[in-house]
Amino acid sequence: MSSRIIRATAANSSIRAFVANTTNLVEKARGFHQTSPVASAALGRTLTATSMMGVMLKGEKQKITTKINGGGPLGVILVVGDSEGNVKGYVGNPQVESTNIRPGKLDVGAAVGSDGEITVIKDLGMKKPYVGTAPLVSGEIGEDFATYFLNSEQQPSAVSLGVLIDIDYRIKASGGFIIQVLPNVQEAVLAKLESRIGQLESITVMMEQGMNEVDILNHVLEGMDPKIVETYEVDFECDCNVARFEKGLISIGRQEIREMIEEDENTELVCHFCNKKYHFNKEQLQGLLDEM
């Protein structure tokens, strides 16, 4: 089953909602990076949130980048997404040791750390990208995105993200939701929503119970008449290619390329996002030098 996001409204369009099932997408990322359980959870949550934020973008070629740096042993989390919800990403230390808060509950906050910030960069096709930052609250990622929305975009939001890891370290389930109130929301609706959010079990419990994205939408916004507006098929997609790496080599300068030619028979470059390896022999490197 492919990963999917639904965009919906509720309460006479005074609430907007995004609900994601990203199980296959996050499993693909785990396969590329061979992440430990806690790294899978942290990366999976960030991929899920960024994918939902991607479909919030208006333009076809607009991009979003999310960077989380909490100073923890996991290192930096970096995720890039497009306006169709497709994402790619990596963590600084994919094999970081996993610890639990309690049995079955990974301590994502300890791995990520909370001494740092979340940065969101939106490339909207303008001269300069939009850059927003917010301090990390817990390193658990869901709370940190909610803080970002409130502090940087002045948008009150409920954010829930979760990744279930199987005993063989594969991704059993992954998903999340972002619920946002719009300026026309009535006080009674807001109070009802706040009460409902406060009563909810975690997103991982919902997924363990077998709920899909539509079930979760109806469960979270029960009694608020949710209506699905659009459905997106999303995936972990890396757009790396030989031409991009050739450009990267050219950008480091003639001297560096000469040193590579002198030192090695073959130069190996690895994509951070998908771990695909690219090899350049001396003749290819010399060809790049000749083009410069």
UniProtKB/Swiss-Prot annotation:
Supply the CDD domains for this chain.
Hsp33
HAMAP family, per this entry?
HslO (MF_00117)
Cytoplasm recorded as keyword: yes
Q: How is it modified after translation?
A: Under oxidizing conditions two disulfide bonds are formed involving the reactive cysteines. Under reducing conditions zinc is bound to the reactive cysteines and the protein is inactive.
Keyword annotations for this protein? Answer: Chaperone, Cytoplasm, Disulfide bond, Redox-active center, Zinc
- Alphabetical list of InterPro entries matching this protein: Heat_shock_Hsp33, Heat_shock_Hsp33_C, Heat_shock_Hsp33_N
Transmembrane domains' residue ranges: none
Q: What is this protein called?
A: 33 kDa chaperonin
Gene3D superfamilies, alphabetized = Hsp33 domain, HSP33 redox switch-like
Purpose: Redox regulated molecular chaperone. Protects both thermally unfolding and oxidatively damaged proteins from irreversible aggregation. Plays an important role in the bacterial defense system toward oxidative stress.
